[in-house]
Amino acid sequence: MTYALLVLEPPGQRSTRTEAEGHEVYGRMVQFSEELKRRGLLTISQSLKTGSTDARVKVRADSSVMITDGPFTEVKEVIGGFFLLTCETREQALAIARECPAAQWATIEVRELGPCFA
């Protein structure tokens, strides 16, 4: 089964770290990804930029398009990154989420991938 681990962070959290702290945190996440890859569980992982490059696109029934540029100050959490995993069970995905270094400063949301009609 394929699972996404979404790293949900408070907006602006990264800017509270010193440069050294940011490098240390990022290094721990890279090591975690490399270990998952070594175990044959990781398809891809990536951190996401937040802020001025964000955008939301909405297409309405009348084909009108609305594009809203970020940052989105009204949000309570931002997706700071993700891991796409192949796991035997949901329990395995949850165990991996508990191992994730980001669980110490963010929320890790575990979502199984599948068709949207199921």
Where are these regions (language model features)?
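Conserved, structured core segments of small domains
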Residues: 1-118
